[in-house]
UniProtKB/Swiss-Prot annotation:
One of its GO terms (biological process) is tRNA methylation. Belongs to the class I-like SAM-binding methyltransferase superfamily. RNA M5U methyltransferase family. TrmA subfamily. Keywords: Methyltransferase, S-adenosyl-L-methionine, Transferase, tRNA processing. The lineage of its organism: Bacteria, Pseudomonadati, Pseudomonadota, Gammaproteobacteria, Vibrionales. S-adenosyl-L-methionine binds at residues 190, 218, 223, 239, 301. The active site is at residues 326, 360. It comes from the Bacteria. It is an enzyme of class 2 (transferase). Dual-specificity methyltransferase that catalyzes the formation of 5-methyluridine at position 54 (m5U54) in all tRNAs, and that of position 341 (m5U341) in tmRNA (transfer-mRNA). This is tRNA/tmRNA (uracil-C(5))-methyltransferase. InterPro entries: MeTrfase_TrmA_AS, MeTrfase_TrmA_CS, SAM-dependent_MTases_sf, TrmA_MeTrfase, U5_MeTrfase_fam. Pfam families: tRNA_U5-meth_tr. It catalyses: uridine(54) in tRNA + S-adenosyl-L-methionine = 5-methyluridine(54) in tRNA + S-adenosyl-L-homocysteine + H(+); uridine(341) in tmRNA + S-adenosyl-L-methionine = 5-methyluridine(341) in tmRNA + S-adenosyl-L-homocysteine + H(+). One of its GO terms (cellular component) is cytosol.
Amino acid sequence: MATLDVNPQRYQQQLAEKVQRLTDMFAPYQAPELEVFESPDQHYRMRAEFRVWHEGEEMYYIMFNQETREKYRVDQFPAASRLINDLMPLLIDAMKDNESLRRKLFQVDFLSTLSGEILVSLLYHRQLDDAWIENAKALKQRLNDEGFNLNLIGRARKMKIVLDRDYVVEKLDVNGKPYTYQQVENSFTQPNGKVAEKMLEWAVDCTQESQGDLLELYCGNGNFSLALAQNFERVLATELAKPSVESAQYNIAANKIENVQIIRMSAEEFTEAMEGKREFRRLKDNGIDLKSYNCNTIFVDPPRSGMDVDTCKMVQGYERILYISCNPETLKENLDILSETHHITRFALFDQFPYTHHMEAGVMLERKA
């Protein structure tokens, strides 16, 4: 993780700079007034990773200055959730005098939740043995006795030892309704829990009074699919990463939602299927007849690289396009194509990453008359 100057007194200033930047970037598209969704000014990040430095009997977390690459000690990390900050010193203190737990430990990853669960991954430059397992179990018990709802993972080359489970269960509040999400270690999850709730509420608001079905590309663990399902008859969602698809299925069942279907495909493959260029057995095996869907709305939340040209062309076939972007530069490139046929009716900034140059944006597009 990079150097981060978390200064609550600077929060509004850095947000205003982002608002100006995003507004200027999208002025050519006649975007409506920007809706701005703030982050907490500290303790907003649900996950954090630290390297571990050994110095004689001492052991502590370090990070690296992005510009100088110099290491510096980290005892607290204001960007991270209070849960992570509470656990950081207790974890290191519990391990530093234990040879089995500290030997060749080089990294600690934290994944926390608004629901109070936390998952810790300990990464080693050595193979882990039975002694490690016994000591790790004792460590987990000790921290749980101190009030943490904690699970533990040990990792080494080609090795993963899970003490109980390798995921947390998050609960996000969307307009007063709680949604349950399984978040698996090393899988993508929204890093800023409070802003994630605001993104879901905005997406639900944008799609009120929708008709027909929803098609969603890049659905991840079903983060948006579940909340948006209330506004549509059916949701058909695609995702390529197998762990995310498995989490999405878990989340559909956990939330007792019956009108969402997830299929494991890339956006590019789905485009080929929609255009009839290829037949995919997995569609048939899952009983999915694409022709039976009546999708007027498509939702996309692509990776930083945005959508390729063919996917953009396919997306243009829908009356309404809801697009969440973690990279406004590639959103802009995609809009050069999408704006030929659609215009922006809603425009939002979500401050997922305070005190950095990164911006998360949302646009709602509707077909031009």
